[in-house]
Structure formats: structure tokens, C-alpha cells
From Swiss-Prot:
Family: Belongs to the ClpX chaperone family.
Alphabetized InterPro entries for the sequence: AAA+_ATPase, ATP-dep_Clp_protease_ClpX, ATPase_AAA_core, Clp_ATPase_C, Clp_protease_ATP-bd_su_ClpX, ClpX_bact, P-loop_NTPase, Znf_CppX_C4
Protein name as catalogued: ATP-dependent Clp protease ATP-binding subunit ClpX
HAMAP family from the UniProt entry: ClpX (MF_00175)
Its biological purpose: ATP-dependent specificity component of the Clp protease. It directs the protease to specific substrates. Can perform chaperone functions in the absence of ClpP.
Electron transport in keyword set: no
SMART domains in UniProt: AAA, ClpB_D2-small, zf-C4_ClpX
Organism: Erythrobacter litoralis (strain HTCC2594)
Annotated positions binding ATP: 120-127
Ranges where the ClpX-type ZB domain occurs: 3-56
Any one GO BP annotation for this protein: cell division
CDD domains: RecA-like_ClpX
Gene: clpX
Record: residues binding Zn(2+): 15, 18, 37, 40
Assembly, per entry: Component of the ClpX-ClpP complex. Forms a hexameric ring that, in the presence of ATP, binds to fourteen ClpP subunits assembled into a disk-like structure with a central cavity, resembling the structure of eukaryotic proteasomes.
Amino acid sequence: MTKLSGTDSKSTLYCSFCGKSQHEVRKLIAGPTVFICDECVELCNDIIREETKAGLTGRKEGDVPAPSEICATLNDYVIGQDRAKRVLSVAVHNHYKRLKHSGKADGVELAKSNILLVGPTGSGKTLLAQTLARTFDVPFTMADATTLTEAGYVGEDVENIILKLLQASDYNVDKAQHGIVYIDEIDKITRKAENPSITRDVSGEGVQQALLKLMEGTTASVPPQGGRKHPQQEFLQVDTTNILFICGGAFAGLDKIIADRLQKRSIGFGAHVADPDKRKVGELLEKSEPEDLLKFGLIPEFVGRLPVIATLHDLDVDALVTILQEPKNAIVKQYSKLFELEDVELTFTDEALQAIAERAILRKTGARGLRSIVEGILLDTMFDLPDLDDISEVVIDADVVEGKKEPIRVVSNDDDGKKEEAA
């Protein structure tokens, strides 16, 4: 096809779509008997982008995806945790269905159901929240509860969470008011003792008190540029009633509180008392009740704002091996892509993947530790790779993972044969 820009030609050409002449646009692209200008091309791109954002499922804009559809999307990115995914899918479906029908005056007001994710580190809590936001194409922000303090103290105000959500929505207040907020490390703001203290706890119980109104629904006054408030400053008013709050934490030690409660209930002649040490942490967390969270250090009002509790299990070796290679953004796929950009094939043997997963189990870092292990294995190879022209493949086996030898570098001969060359 030919590009024609505006010239002083006798025959003036026009865009077949908008009718503008070649002198009114920057570029006019010629096709068989038709022309299209650069403005129409840009408009077509915008239309395609908007349709892509609306989703590839054929849903009309404003339709709420079914729980099974939400769960299927979560399955593409998160391995295992089937029960947690079902709980999340139903809760989020009901939340956005509530928003869609909130204007109907039938006398029934649907309450908001914020979500608490309980599970060990590296089990997928953060990834679940991120995937949910991607599914609904809504503003999403993450906050670390350990950095939050009460207003007026050194640290980050809880209202800064809403500021981050505004920034994620390009300061579109209406869009931000339907976003998702994920607060990580929520177990780190528990009060220091089960009984109320006479001393001020500005980073524990004080933060829980400050978060209460945000989570229940209030109009937050947010300074557009962040920072501390002062009287002369203009504020953005954000209604948090329809913002979905998801809180996550490892809650280390909660399993022991649950085990103690279950053991007390089993006292008596003929009672079957299971050894708490033989129970898996995930099995105990599934039996968590509000009274356990209160004993852990959350205040009753805060627990009441989190009616939906989803528990996640420790990931076993098989799950970690699957995480390494199957999700859409799997770690092995990411590093294979990096090597592919250097025209080199990266291969992990099954034994190597098993060894990487076992090392992550020993480190007790869950799926989060897989990337650092793979990065350490491939670091020297990635350093040398741009300077090596004859390498066609790099093979990682179990001995490489265990540090017994260097990654196997495969070089190509002129006759397209291959031979192995140790690094």
C-alpha cells in the first residue's frame, strides 16, 4: 500500500471513511480503490482497544461474570487453592452484582462483603487479588499494613490507600469508587495483647480502628498530591462504600490457637484427640472462627467488617512444579522468553523442576521463592550469553540445581549437528 501526504496535486484524494481531503490530514493510506486517513486508523485502534478491555467472553458492558467464569480466569494464573478460588469468585460476583442493582428501589439493601485471605507466605494471596482486578478491569492498588499508622503520627495515613487507588484510576473518582484494594500483612497490625491496653498502640489496634470506616463505607477527603493535610489544601471526596477491600496475611501462630480450641472441645472419656503436630496448617486454618481471630489480636469490629474468609494451603512439591511451568505467566516461560530473545533455547528437565520445588519447600518461601532460586541458577549464564554466538541451547538438570555442576551449554556445528559443552 502507498502512503500519500497532502501535496499541491490537481487531483485531490479523500478518505473513504470520514471524507476529509488529503490536505486536512497528515497521512492518507491508499488501498484498492479506497483511502483511509491516519485519524480513522487511530479511531479504529481505540475501538479495538476498548472492545479488548471489555473482555473476550462476549459479555455486554456492565454484565457481571458468573462465578465459574471468574474461577476459570483465576485458574489461568493461580495453581491449586481451589476452595479459596470458589469463595473469592462467589464473593466478588455478589459484590459487583450488588453494585449493578444498587439503584433499584425495592427496599432490600445488599451489604458489602469484604474478604479476608488467610494463608502462609507464597501461597498466592496477592496473586489472587491482582488477577481479580485484571478480570474486572477495575482500578487496583496494594497497601502494606505494616507502614500504616493513625493520622497525626509518623508513617502512612490509611487514607493514602485511597490516594493510591485514585492514582491507579488516573484520578477518575467514579472509577476509583468501584475499585479493589488489597491490604497485605494485615496480621501485623494486631494489638499487642488480647486485653485492651491503656497505652497508645498507633501501628496496631489504632490502625484497625482507622481502617474500620474506610472498609464499612465513608467519604474520604484525599489530598490530590498526597502527604499530610493542611487547611488551605483542596481535597478530593471519595465514597468508599462500593470499594471492595481484600485483606491478606500469613497469621503465623493462628493454627496453634485453633488447635488449642479444638483440643479443649475434645476433652472427655472416649473423645478422639488428634495430635495437633500431625495436622497440616491448612487443615487447621480451614476451621478458623471469628473467636480465633479475636484471640490472635484483631478487634471485634474489624473482624465484623470481613465476613468472607478464604483460607489457603501450603503448596506441596507437585503444586510448585506446576506453578513453575503451567500458568500463563509461569517462571519457566518467562526465562525461556528471555533466552529466546538471544536466539537460545532454555530447557529444564523434570528432575530439575522437582529439585527447584524441593528447595523452595526447605526455604519455606512457597511460590514466591521460586523466582530467586531460578535466578540464582541462571545468573552466570545470563551474564555470559550476549557474548556467546555459538550457543543454541542451555539445559538445566537436577545436578545443576544442586550446585554440582554448571548449566549445560549446547553449541551448534556448521553441519547443524549439536554437541554438549560444559561451561
